[in-house]
Swiss-Prot record:
This is Uncharacterized transporter slr0944. GO terms for molecular function: antimonite transmembrane transporter activity; antiporter activity; arsenite transmembrane transporter activity. Gene3D superfamilies: 1.20.1530.20. The chain crosses the membrane at residues 25-45, 53-73, 103-123, 139-159, 166-186, 200-220, 238-258, 272-292, 309-329, 332-352. InterPro entries: Arsenical-R_Acr3 (IPR004706), BilAc:Na_symport/Acr3 (IPR002657), Na+/solute_symporter_sf (IPR038770). GO terms for cellular component: plasma membrane. Signal peptide: none annotated. It comes from Synechocystis sp. (strain ATCC 27184 / PCC 6803 / Kazusa).
Length: 383
């Protein structure tokens, strides 16, 4: 039996490509390559990091821009106007992402990394001239992940879970705009509460460079291309050739990061697992909260599933970029954000399957979905 595409629904998302499907494998390869680079050519990473302006590494900034821009150019911000037509799921995702999720991430990170696993994380590192324990540095990375709701791969999660992709696009647009204004103040406040001093100007500059600049470039170039080249050329040609650039930029950033952190990982492979514990629990906890709230609000499954999935997943590109700028490429905070990348795909695919298996809990409105649920299609139109 083959799933049927709904011709009436908004086309967004799709099946995972080779990179996205095996993201965990590529990150693991980057760990190996980065560690080898750090061991064999230790001067390379230091030289690259020395090319900086106001503590912003130019090579890394370039990589991070090309990692972020393809994500931003894919977002249709005109969909944000549609939020008034579906207020309940949009309000739900905003409340979860910006009122609940940041604080539960702090609680889980502090409990596991700052208390339970603290005896295993007693080493320190120097960040901006300040001696910081690895535990606190890892907590900072977790916080930066926790306040960055996913706006990219969630389209794929929504598609695979038979969700309302029109609503998913609305939530992506609204959360991206919210991130531009809320990420810096929330990050500053929560990091300060975790005994990590971050200059206000630095985190604002980080958001402007790694969110604002790609966002502005994405909005303008999307508008210009759609106006002069048309949607078909934009989707079939421009995005087709742009996606590999984002992949290469992400992989280069990860290789450089692990070139710095190679020795720590070789000596303490347990750290990767320890960081993954609060991230895994946070992802599942937020998913459960949002999913249950969607049930209580009497949302249809097609609206509740993407709301839960966008809350559960993280915008790891923004988190990596911010951690690198605030704490440095060789910081524990940057390493913690990469652990988020490492577990993202397998955990989210697990949650997609949970959504599909529990869809019967909710009222169904299958015609909203781009990929129709075969369980909701009449036998005669199954292919």
């Amino acid at each position: 039996m083959v799933n049927r595409i709904n011709p009436k629904a908004i086309k967004a998302g799709g099946t995972l490509n080779l990179f996205e499907k095996y993201l965990t494998l590529w990150v693991a390869l980057c760990i190996v390559i980065g560690i080898a680079l750090g061991k064999l050519l230790p001067a390379v990473a230091q030289t690259l990091d020395s090319w900086s302006i106001y503590n912003v590494s130019i090579p890394i900034a370039i990589c991070l821009f090309f990692m972020m821009y393809p994500i931003m150019v894919k977002i249709d911000f005109s969909q944000a106007r549609q939020a008034v037509k579906a207020p309940k799921p949009v309000i739900l995702t905003l409340v979860v992402n910006w009122v609940i999720k940041p604080f539960t991430m702090v609680i889980f990170a502090q409990f596991f990394l700052g208390y339970l696993f603290a005896p295993l994380l007693t080493a320190t590192e120097i960040i901006r001239g300040q001696e910081v324990t690895l535990a606190n540095s890892y907590i900072a990375g977790c916080i930066l992940l926790g306040i960055a709701p996913c706006t990219a791969m969630v389209l794929m999660w929504g598609y695979l879970s038979y969700s309302n992709q029109g609503l998913t696009l609305v939530m992506v647009a609204v959360n991206s705009l919210a991130m531009l204004f809320l990420y810096a103040p929330l990050g500053k406040w929560l990091l300060a509460a975790s005994n990590l001093t971050v200059p206000w100007q630095t985190i604002v500059l980080s958001v402007l460079i790694y969110v604002g600049l790609p966002l502005a470039a994405g909005i303008y170039s999307r508008y210009w291309i759609l106006k002069h080249k048309g949607r078909q050329w934009f989707e079939s040609q421009f995005l087709h050739y742009l996606s590999p650039i984002a992949i290469v930029a992400l992989l280069l950033t990860l290789i450089l990061l692990f070139a710095f952190k190679g020795e720590l990982i070789v000596n303490n492979p347990l750290h990767i697992f320890l960081i993954a514990v609060p991230l895994f629990i946070q992802t599942n906890f937020i998913f459960l909260i949002t999913y249950v709230l969607g049930l209580k609000l009497k949302l249809s499954y097609e609206d509740a599933a993407p709301a839960a999935l966008i809350g559960a997943s993280n915008h790891f590109e923004v988190a990596i970029a911010t951690a690198v700028m605030l704490f440095g490429l060789n910081s524990g905070a940057a390493l913690a954000t990469v652990v988020g990348v490492l577990i993202e795909v397998p955990v989210m695919l697990m949650l997609v399957e949970i959504c599909k298996k529990t869809a019967f809990w909710f009222p169904r409105d299958p015609e909203k979905a781009t990929l129709l649920d075969p369980r909701c299609i009449n036998q005669e139109i199954r292919i």
